[in-house]
Amino acid sequence: MANPVGFRFRPTDGEIVDIYLRPKNLESNTSHVDEVISTVDICSFDPWDLPSHSRMKTRDQVWYFFGRKENKYGKGDRQIRKTKSGFWKKTGVTMDIMRKTGDREKIGEKRVLVFKNHGGSKSDWAMHEYHATFSSPNQIMTYTLCKVKFKGERREFSVATGSGIKHTHSLIPPTNNSGVLSVETEGSLFHSQESQNPSQFSGFLDVDALDRDFCNILSDDFKGFFNDDDEQSKIVSMQDDRNNHTPQKPLTGVFSDHSTDGSDSDPISATTISIQTLSTCPSFGSSNPLYQITDLQESPNSIKLVSLAQEVSKTPGTGIDNDAQGTEIGEHKLGQETIKNKRAGFFHRMIQKFVKKIHLRT
């Protein structure tokens, strides 16, 4: 039912009971009141869902409904007032409604109720529930008339009308194949929290600023923590890939020795020496000597390196293997200790920064 411009449906308490509620309960033909006020089960809907069921489309944020009276118990006058998201709570005392003309008799009662969400938090929704009273005991009241009112701002009402729709947002961030939270995902979570309006958190600027600072601390330290693990994994992978190491090419040079005694009987000769350099990651179990020195042209004054090479080559290969294996085990243990120390340091730094931020805020 569309209202003309300037039309307002604002009946008084006496008009609500005398003109609409009493005919709804007493008369057999109620079409003239049903065209104005719709009949609904009030407690089957949350208050923000009721405006869409009203026949009167108004911008006053007040809606009228007929509702069938349903007692909570077989005896007594207590009614069912529980909805899906909360309940209607009676407040104040019951007020009598008197007829303004004639004998000024009592024609009804008005009860004021407020809607409370689960948990007892009060909302901006209120309801005036009207009951008709009859002089004859044979007249039984079947219907009540409810005036539902939203006392908040219109902008808040537009949000409240959509609050019945449930939105589900996933709080589980994506992970990689190993089930570990990636650094990019971790950073995006913290940045998304920082970009939100502080009023959406707690409403207190100091607490929200502290929350954002803590997120920044976590973001920086988590990135450094994961980077340290990446570097450690690279070191371990290098240690595990020793057999694929290619030895360096031999170095060839010319060494000349000039005699200091000035004798011409022993001519000065040049010695060409080929040296195979020692690799940092030798191939274990190899029978080849670590150093191979070849004297291409012997001379009394040439550099004596052959004996040194022979002594080195006489060293058993098993001893080298055992030492190398021991070194590898020691490096692996050292890597594990490094990871533990970095993790402990990460949590220590995070707690220190957070405590420092708390002191600055307070």
Swiss-Prot record:
<dbReference type="InterPro" id="IPR003441">
    <property type="entry name" value="NAC-dom"/>
</dbReference>
<keyword id="KW-0238">DNA-binding</keyword>
<dbReference type="InterPro" id="IPR036093">
    <property type="entry name" value="NAC_dom_sf"/>
</dbReference>
<dbReference type="GO" id="GO:0003677">
    <property type="term" value="F:DNA binding"/>
</dbReference>
<keyword id="KW-0805">Transcription regulation</keyword>
<feature type="DNA-binding region">
    <location>
        <begin position="107"/>
        <end position="157"/>
    </location>
</feature>
<dbReference type="GO" id="GO:0005886">
    <property type="term" value="C:plasma membrane"/>
</dbReference>
<dbReference type="GO" id="GO:0010089">
    <property type="term" value="P:xylem development"/>
</dbReference>
<dbReference type="GO" id="GO:0003700">
    <property type="term" value="F:DNA-binding transcription factor activity"/>
</dbReference>
<feature type="region of interest" description="Disordered">
    <location>
        <begin position="240"/>
        <end position="266"/>
    </location>
</feature>
<keyword id="KW-0804">Transcription</keyword>
<dbReference type="GO" id="GO:0005634">
    <property type="term" value="C:nucleus"/>
</dbReference>
<protein>
    <recommendedName>
        <fullName>NAC domain-containing protein 5</fullName>
    </recommendedName>
</protein>
<keyword id="KW-0539">Nucleus</keyword>
<feature type="domain" description="NAC">
    <location>
        <begin position="3"/>
        <end position="151"/>
    </location>
</feature>
<dbReference type="Pfam" id="PF02365">
    <property type="entry name" value="NAM"/>
</dbReference>
